[in-house]
């Protein structure tokens, strides 16, 4: 911070001290800027001039910082069309065109727009060179052309990285071919064509590095050094682009600048001229720099991995880390370890294989990688005097006595030190030790039914600190960060990290898939409000579309939620082990950092309450469909209670937890409160009661007792709601009427007036339908006060399919007939959730840890 302040003070002092009465920032129409002349911006920050490199006759027109310690051109007008000798000049001709001349001949036309107005060229203090059409009063009328629209290898604050949808114009950086050769090189830094909210570096047209997705004002790649940058993302109908401004703590609005070098690395160049890395390139064995980056002369090392599909690059010397999917081009296995290159100057005894890249010149770095990709390659060299072109040999080409070739720099491949092989042994050992250690700890935890201790956590963290990387199991486009807490949670869930196989394979696999936060964010358009389906005690629910086109519903645990890890694990473990056509399918989960999400199959018709309690939408539910929905719920509950490998009590059956697929088939959802019973266990007790008002059985509400008969009670309430088209608690505003729907139906049943409770939208035919009347009686049997009097779900099946010859027993007094429920003084009763019409395709219940 103090160093930046000192440099900023000196820089400002230099600007004002160096001002001259003779300098100008403007080139008028008809004037010429020649070698030895400069345009200097108003506050002496930037200058435009012709320049050349030492021992080169090629001259370039470029913009530089106008001070003694910030070297290097930030923009070059004619990078691919140098002027031979000192004959170059820049002018705005009589037609308003901006042209670079070689002598009297036109070399390069920067702006071809013709205008009859007064036109001037001005260098701004932002570093932008603008061709402006002026009004008669001297004010600017419009910008005809600007250098910011044609970046070279450097990005300044205010410049764009992206593209114009309508014109196809792209704003991107392109590396130099060499240190003294500014022609367009092999690396391009810009916006991804397919995923517009991320930046990529392309090498020879292939993805070399990616920034991660833009989300909540930042990039998802953690080890991206954005200190000093304030990035913004703009997306309109015509343009998509990134832009950044400078942070005041890092040099103010003009700094830092970003440059892509010849090896594909992004450099941050601060006010003091010091270069630091913005990102970590594909890992190499080398010296550790800021943010864990490794770099040294590339010819003296071999990348541990050079990939771009499921390619794993990061900031460690082992090559495991950030993952994304693109076409792959691995290095040959022989090149991964134990080789270096020795530089020698010698004639070549014979000609090698010369790469002829049409329309492109290969840099020395490109040639180096071409050699690495070929196990037969033992040497490489540039074919041109400027360091471009590529020639490789499969035998040693050096021959000091050869007279047929001139001496040139050749890089000979030799076996290097045993460092890489040593690291391979170390890494392999760690990969063996870490899983074994985790397995032992997991078995101990399971044996003693311990969910985790500080000792275990600290031990695992210590083990992790001794290793440089954890095994990076990738799921094609899905990935989870491998922190200790996440791994322990996944172990508890019984989930192993693995590749996401083909779709058919996944459908046959009952285990959960693991999704990365990045993939879920991308699927939901970064949790946009447009994809939000609803919100409840668990948190918001979003609709998403996976990369393979599958639609999903995503429950995202809110940090402010009263629910927590217990409910998350409960639902994830239960649904993963339960498979039935009338149970909602859980596809996977996301456990990354503080994020916990559940990913379900998407239910396009939302939930039952969405239709049932709306006066217009309920018309869709005729009696045939309502009965089919009840059948499906019965089959789902029967499976949970009797036929699944686990005996499960749901404890929160209600209309909002019945989801409807595209064919209106019901699926039971929300297993956060569910409990598993042993084979010989019939009931259980809890001291913390939570649920939905109107659906809880009296023994559960008053005493905390629950069993399969608790679900039967809830189902009975739901049956009455389906038949009557009203909520159970819809009577509570009527002080003189019945307490709830149960009491209302019971009173009319005793008076033989049960037809009056049937939903009028079902029509007259339903009123006389004996099946409807039978279902009313079955529902009353399910909501009886005494749990022992209620039928089992297996009994319910036989009851609803019976006919007049199979008489039903008369129901006894229903629950809560004697007044509102009162809890026991020993019970801790949480405020019940009031039932609302749900807009969710996945529902949420307020729950408390048990």
UniProtKB/Swiss-Prot annotation:
The modification Phosphoserine is found at residues 561, 669, 730, 838. It is an enzyme of class 2 (transferase). Promotes the expression of genes involved in photosynthesis at least in dedifferentiated calli. It catalyses: L-seryl-[protein] + ATP = O-phospho-L-seryl-[protein] + ADP + H(+); L-threonyl-[protein] + ATP = O-phospho-L-threonyl-[protein] + ADP + H(+). One of its GO terms (molecular function) is ATP binding. ATP binds at residues 533-541, 555. Disulfide bonds join 367-390, 371-377. Glycans are attached at residues 55, 118, 194, 374. Belongs to the protein kinase superfamily. Ser/Thr protein kinase family. It is found in: Cell membrane. This is G-type lectin S-receptor-like serine/threonine-protein kinase CES101. One of its GO terms (biological process) is innate immune response. Residues 334-416 form the PAN domain. It comes from the Eukaryota. The active site is at 652 (proton acceptor). Residues 24-144 form the Bulb-type lectin domain. Mostly expressed in leaves, and, to a lower extent, in roots and flowers. Residues 23-423 are extracellular. GO terms for cellular component: plasma membrane. The chain crosses the membrane at residues 424-444. It comes from Arabidopsis thaliana. Keywords: ATP-binding, Cell membrane, Disulfide bond, Glycoprotein, Kinase, Lectin, Membrane, Nucleotide-binding, Phosphoprotein, Receptor, Serine/threonine-protein kinase, Signal, Transferase, Transmembrane, Transmembrane helix. Residues 445-850 are cytoplasmic. Gene3D superfamilies: Bulb-type lectin domain (2.90.10.10), Phosphorylase Kinase, domain 1 (3.30.200.20), Transferase(Phosphotransferase) domain 1 (1.10.510.10). Residues 527-816 form the Protein kinase domain. Residues 1-22 form the signal peptide. It is a single-pass type I membrane protein.
């Amino acid at each position: 911070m103090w160093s930046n302040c000192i440099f900023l003070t000196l820089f400002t002092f230099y600007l004002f001290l160096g001002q001259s009465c003779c300098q100008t920032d403007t080139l008028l129409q008809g004037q010429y800027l020649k070698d030895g002349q400069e345009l200097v911006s108003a506050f002496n920050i930037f200058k435009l001039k012709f320049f050349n490199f030492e021992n080169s006759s090629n001259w370039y027109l470029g913009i530089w910082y106008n001070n003694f310690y910030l070297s290097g051109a930030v923009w070059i007008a004619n990078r691919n069309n140098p002027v031979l000798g000192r004959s170059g000049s820049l002018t705005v001709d009589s037609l308003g065109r901006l042209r670079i001349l070689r002598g009297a001949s036109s070399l390069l036309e920067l702006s071809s727009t013709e205008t009859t107005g007064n036109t001037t060229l001005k260098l701004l203090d932002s570093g932008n060179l603008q061709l402006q059409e002026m009004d008669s009063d001297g004010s600017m009328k419009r910008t005809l052309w600007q250098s910011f629209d044609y970046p070279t290898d450097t990005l300044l604050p205010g410049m764009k990285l992206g593209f114009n949808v309508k014109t196809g114009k792209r704003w991107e950086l392109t590396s130099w071919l060499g240190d003294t050769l500014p022609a367009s090189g092999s690396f391009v830094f810009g916006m991804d064509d397919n995923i517009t909210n991320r930046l990529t570096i392309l090498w020879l047209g292939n993805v070399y590095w990616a920034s991660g997705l833009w989300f909540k004002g930042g990039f998802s790649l953690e080890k991206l050094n954005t200190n000093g940058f304030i990035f913004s993302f703009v997306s309109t109908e015509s343009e998509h682009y990134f832009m950044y401004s400078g942070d005041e703590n890092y040099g103010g609005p003009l700094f830092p600048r970003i440059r892509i070098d010849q090896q594909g690395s992004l450099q941050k160049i601060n006010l003091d001229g010091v270069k630091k890395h913005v990102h970590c390139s594909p890992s190499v064995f080398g010296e550790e720099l800021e943010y864990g980056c490794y770099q040294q002369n590339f010819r003296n090392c071999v990348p541990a991995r050079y990939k771009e599909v499921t390619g794993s690059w990061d900031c460690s010397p082992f090559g495991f880390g950030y993952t994304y999917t693109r076409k792959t081009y691995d290095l040959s296995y022989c090149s991964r370890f134990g080789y270096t290159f020795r530089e020698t100057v010698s004639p070549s005894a014979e000609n090698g294989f010369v790469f002829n890249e049409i329309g492109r010149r290969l840099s020395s770095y490109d040639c180096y990688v071409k050699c690495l990709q070929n196990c037969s390659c033992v040497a490489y060299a540039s074919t041109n005097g400027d360091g471009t072109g590529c020639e490789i040999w499969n035998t040693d080409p050096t021959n000091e006595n050869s007279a047929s070739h001139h001496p040139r720099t050749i890089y000979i491949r030799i076996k290097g030190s045993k460092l890489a092989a040593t690291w391979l042994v170390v890494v392999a050992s760690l990969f063996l030790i870490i899983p074994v250690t985790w397995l032992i700890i997991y078995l101990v935890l399971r044996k003693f039914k311990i969910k985790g201790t500080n000792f275990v956590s600290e031990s695992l963290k210590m083990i992790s600190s001794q290793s440089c990387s954890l095994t990076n199991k990738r799921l094609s486009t899905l990935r989870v960060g491998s922190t200790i807490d996440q791994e322990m949670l996944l172990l508890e869930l019984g989930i192993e990290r693995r590749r996401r196989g083909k779709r058919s394979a996944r459908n046959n696999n009952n285990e959960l898939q693991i999704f990365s936060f990045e993939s879920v964010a991308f699927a939901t358009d970064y949790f946009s409000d447009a994809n939000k389906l609803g919100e409840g005690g668990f948190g918001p629910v979003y609709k998403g579309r996976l990369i393979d086109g599958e639609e999903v519903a995503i429950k995202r645990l809110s940090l402010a939620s009263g629910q927590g890890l217990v409910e998350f694990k409960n639902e994830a473990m239960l649904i993963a082990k339960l498979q039935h056509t009338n149970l909602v399918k859980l596809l996977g989960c996301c456990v990354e950092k503080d994020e916990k999400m559940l990913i379900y199959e998407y239910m396009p018709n939302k939930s039952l309450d969405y239709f049932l309690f709306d006066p217009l939408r309920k018309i869709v539910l005729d009696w045939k469909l309502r009965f089919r929905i009840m059948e499906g719920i019965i089959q789902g509950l029967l499976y949970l209670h009797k036929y699944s490998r686990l005996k499960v009590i749901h404890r929160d059956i209600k209309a909002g937890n019945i989801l409807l697929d595209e064919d209106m088939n019901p699926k039971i959802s929300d297993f956060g409160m569910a409990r598993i019973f042993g084979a010989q266990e019939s009931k259980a007790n809890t001291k913390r009661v939570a649920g939905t008002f109107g659906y809880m059985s009296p023994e559960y509400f008053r005493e905390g007792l629950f069993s399969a008969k608790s679900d039967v009670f809830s189902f009975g309430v739901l049956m009455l709601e389906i038949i009557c088209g009203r909520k159970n608690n819809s009577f509570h505003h009527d002080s003189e009427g019945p307490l709830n729907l149960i009491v209302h139906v019971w009173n009319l049943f005793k008076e033989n007036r049960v037809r009056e409770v049937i939903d009028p939208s079902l029509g007259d035919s339903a009123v006389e339908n004996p099946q409807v009347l039978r279902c009313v009686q079955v529902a009353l049997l399910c909501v009886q006060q005494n749990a022992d009097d209620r039928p089992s779900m297996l009994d319910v099946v036989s009851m609803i399919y019976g006919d007049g010859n199979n008489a039903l027993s008369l129901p006894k007094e229903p629950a809560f007939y004697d007044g509102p429920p009162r809890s026991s003084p020993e019970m801790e009763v949480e405020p019940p959730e009031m039932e609302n019409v749900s807009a969710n395709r996945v529902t949420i219940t307020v729950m408390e840890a048990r």
